[in-house]
């Protein structure tokens, strides 16, 4: 096998555990576009504090758990991170985010839902070690793509419009 090809192959698909190669697979995550009738045209946005994507803007979300539906994951993540419940939860889009030089490959499913004001007040930052805090940000006034967490930047590149009437 050509050395350059082997290097790329190893980077993309193999890791070593106990001296044996193991297949690497992309992670699967959920990003949640939380909207609110009291904040028209806005979504809930936070700023990451963790190593991966530190300092970039993110939506609520995280890893999908084994056996969990997309809807269940979205509800769980926004409850864990912001203490809110959603209504009218639905599929938004999906992105495939790859940065081999950072050993990063995630498929992110974006769900969209409205803040359920019959249950929830304003979102609160329940994971201050991971996020600087939540704020409502107009979709049209988002930070530039280079300041967004990679999956969110990829969603913006798709020209996804969460407030477009279908």
Go through the PLM ranges and name each one.
Residues 25-29, 54, 59, 86, ...:
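Short connector loops at helix/strand junctions that flank enzyme active sites
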Residues 152-166:
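Charged phosphate-binding loop/patch that engages nucleotide di/tri-phosphates or the phosphate backbone
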Residues 1-10:
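N-terminal mitochondrial targeting presequence
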Residues 50-52, 94-97:
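Short active-site-proximal "capping" loops at secondary-structure junctions
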Residues 40-80:
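Conserved Nudix-box catalytic region and its N-terminal flanking loop in Nudix hydrolases
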Residues 16-43, 94, 109-114:
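Conserved N-terminal beta-strand and adjoining loop/helix that marks the start
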Residues 64-87, 95-151:
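Unchanged
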């Amino acid at each position: 096998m050509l050395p350059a090809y082997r290097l790329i192959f190893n980077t993309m698909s193999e890791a070593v555990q106990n001296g044996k190669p193991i297949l690497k697979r992309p992670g699967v995550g959920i990003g949640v576009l939380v909207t609110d009738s009291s904040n028209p045209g806005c979504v809930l946005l936070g700023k990451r504090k963790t190593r991966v994507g530190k300092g970039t803007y993110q939506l609520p979300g995280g890893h999908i758990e084994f056996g969990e539906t997309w809807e269940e994951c979205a509800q769980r993540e926004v409850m864990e991170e912001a203490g809110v419940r959603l209504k009218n939860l639905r599929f938004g889009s999906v992105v495939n985010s790859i940065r081999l030089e950072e050993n990063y490959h995630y498929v992110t499913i974006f769900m969209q839902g409205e803040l359920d004001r019959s249950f929830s007040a304003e979102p609160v930052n329940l994971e201050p070690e991971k996020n600087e805090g939540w704020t409502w940000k107009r979709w049209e006034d988002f930070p530039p793509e280079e300041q967004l967490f990679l999956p969110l930047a990829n969603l913006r590149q798709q020209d996804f419009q969460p407030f477009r009437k279908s």
